[in-house]
């Protein structure tokens, strides 16, 4: 199982490490795992792995559009700033998301979870309603997946964007 966590722009580090591993393997990273899971930025990375989108593409997205995707906000430095940042995390999504949506649409198009090449699990939380949902590919016969869900919509639900709350 490859499990990838969130962390906003800090996900660039994980993306770089995964891209280097993928490059050294000489094949898509997803072929080495039975299940791929991720939340928030880890969800984006997990989708890339599950769909065999080269991780170098995600690294480029972070490097070229990271400031727009993450609102150009730096890391919280002081105690008060960290508390305000935590409050924003609890009361709603931190980021607007239109730039990210446009970029994801460009790479994933109208692909659905059924199009994933590898088993995938994306837990999502609607923080405004305290509702959780686990989106998944139909990788277990007894468990219905969310195969009709568009990838772009799932990544938006995954803790990032206001408009997607209704999907949870």
Please provide the spans of the model-predicted regions.
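Contiguous domain-boundary segments centered on the initiation and propagation of an alpha-helix
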Residues: 89-91, 101-109, 148, 159, ...
